[in-house]
């Protein structure tokens, strides 16, 4: 974030936790941990920046805030997790695994818009195309994920999916993995 972005973040309230649930991100986590004196959380097996310590996010373990639980992918090449917030019928917070990038926005160049459209990025209730290529996930994880009760999804890529996230992602899991 630039200075204006940091000011906007500060205006939202106190940053107490920096949570890394996706292996393909987090290069600036140490900056935010230091700036805010925040607790750093990662999935087991994720690298931790030098000079930073991290608490481990594990299903059934300690979590960054009350009313939160952790889902861990067990059949991927890199660690990845999803947080489930027990509010409003269940809210999933995902990084790269679940995406809801419906259309490209004004920040896409024409070239990237064409490339990413061709790669299958702009799909409602999607599994991240690059994440799929890198991680080669298995259906067993999505069968487990499908068992979670959730109505909404906040994905690291795309718009919030409200009210029908459980049904829409379940249909995607069935289409891609037969579960």
Task: Please name every model-derived segment.
Residues 61-63, 175-178:
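Short, structured secondary-structure boundary patches
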Residues 62-73:
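Short Pro/Gly-enriched beta-strand edge/turn motifs at strand-loop
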Residues 29-30, 70-72, 80-81:
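Short helix-to-loop capping/linker segments positioned immediately adjacent to catalytic or ligand/cofactor-binding
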Residues 24, 74-75:
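Short, glycine/acidic-rich beta->alpha junctions
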Residues 1, 76-177:
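Metallo-beta-lactamase
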Residues 6-64:
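Active-site HxH/HxHxD metal-binding segment of metal-dependent hydrolases
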Residues 12, 39, 145, 176-179:
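Alpha-helix boundary/capping residues
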């Amino acid at each position: 974030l630039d200075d204006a972005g940091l000011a906007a973040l500060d205006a939202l309230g106190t940053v107490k936790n920096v949570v890394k649930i996706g292996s393909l991100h987090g290069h600036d986590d140490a900056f935010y941990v230091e700036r805010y004196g925040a607790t750093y959380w990662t999935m087991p097996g994720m690298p931790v920046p030098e000079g930073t310590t991290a608490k481990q996010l594990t299903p059934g373990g300690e979590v960054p805030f009350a009313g939160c639980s952790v889902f861990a992918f067990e059949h991927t090449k890199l660690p990845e997790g999803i947080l489930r917030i027990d509010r409003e019928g269940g809210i999933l917070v995902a990084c790269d695994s679940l995406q809801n990038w419906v259309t490209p926005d004004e920040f896409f160049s024409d070239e990237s818009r064409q490339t990413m459209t061709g790669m299958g990025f702009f799909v409602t209730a999607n599994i991240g195309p690059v994440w799929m290529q890198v991680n080669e996930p298995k259906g067993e994880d999505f069968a487990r994920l499908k068992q979670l009760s959730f109505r909404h999804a906040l994905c690291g890529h795309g718009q919030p999916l409200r009210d029908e996230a459980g049904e829409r992602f379940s249909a995607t899991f069935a289409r891609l993995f037969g579960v």
